[in-house]
UniProtKB/Swiss-Prot annotation:
Stated name of the protein: Octanoyltransferase
Cited InterPro entries: aa-tRNA-synth_II/BPL/LPL, BPL_LPL_catalytic, Octanoyltransferase, Octanoyltransferase_CS
GO MF annotations in UniProt: lipoyl(octanoyl) transferase activity
NCBIfam families: lipB (TIGR00214), PRK14341.1 (NF010921), PRK14345.1 (NF010925)
Gene that encodes it: lipB
Biological process annotations from GO: protein modification process
Note: In the reaction, the free carboxyl group of octanoic acid is attached via an amide linkage to the epsilon-amino group of a specific lysine residue of lipoyl domains of lipoate-dependent enzymes.
Family label: Belongs to the LipB family.
A single GO cellular-component term on record: cytoplasm
Length: 241
């Protein structure tokens, strides 16, 4: 069932006039603890008015993260390090070929509504996928963005993007992960997002037959972000936020 969040009024998350969101790209994989420390520091600075909002694009080395709803049984095989984290959600995989976007926005100033914010993140991904002629969809009982897979059988769907966020003083951090061309076999070692129904799997742009560069995905993400959340300002590649 398609979630009624698809009717989201995208004007619910406007930026203040004249304010730009920093848009930062790291060109080498960032260790997870380093990323979390940088996000927490930036979120605190945003909350205190000492820094601007930020979208941080990066990749991680292969690893698993477990959110606040994660269960020990969701890790089937410890192929890579597992990090417990304060984001919402359960267990997922991060690694090369996956575009992670950490989103640090001041929702108190924009609109303090977590559910609508998550719907906004989904809309951002869906519009990004539209660039590549992929139909991403929301689902009522499954956060993230899904792609119908009738080629696998009736009712089959695969997740192409995961969402997990945390708020502190109404500033968001953590964010989204979009599968561009990761090694999907690494998801076999976990129960992704706690979903055990065999009809629901994981996919990527490459798995769907699209070989695209991360730079092309980044450009699409930035365009779609501007439509949903407002304009951004590109910063030179760095390894920390």
């Amino acid at each position: 069932m398609v979630n009624n969040r698809q009717t989201l009024d995208l004007k619910l998350f406007p930026a203040s006039p004249g304010e730009l969101v920093d848009w930062q790209l790291s060109d080498t994989p960032v260790p997870y603890p380093e990323a979390v420390a940088a996000m927490e520091a930036r979120a605190a600075a945003i909350a205190s008015g000492e820094a601007s909002e930020l979208v941080w694009l990066l990749e991680h080395p292969p690893l698993y993260t477990s959110g606040t709803s994660g269960r020990e049984t969701d890790l089937l095989q410890a192929r890579f390090p597992l990090f417990s984290t304060g984001r919402g959600g359960q267990v997922t995989y991060h690694g090369p070929g996956q575009r992670v976007a950490y989103v640090m926005l001041d929702l108190k100033r924009r609109r303090p509504d977590v559910r609508a914010f998550v719907a906004g993140l989904e809309e951002w991904i869906i519009r990004t996928l539209d660039t590549f002629d992929i139909k991403g969809e929301r689902r009522e009982d499954r956060v993230g963005v899904w792609v119908a897979r009738p080629d696998k059988g009736p009712g089959h769907e695969d997740k192409i993007a995961a969402i997990g966020v945390r708020l502190r003083r109404w500033v968001s951090f953590h964010g989204i992960s979009l599968n561009v061309d990761p090694d999907l076999s690494h998801f076999d070692a976990i129960v992704p997002c706690g979903i055990t129904d065999a009809r629901y799997g994981v996919t990527s742009l490459a798995d769907l037959g699209l070989r695209v560069r991360l730079s092309d995905v980044d450009a699409a993400l930035r365009r779609a972000f501007g439509e949903v959340f407002g304009p951004s300002e590109l910063r030179l590649p760095e390894t920390t936020a």
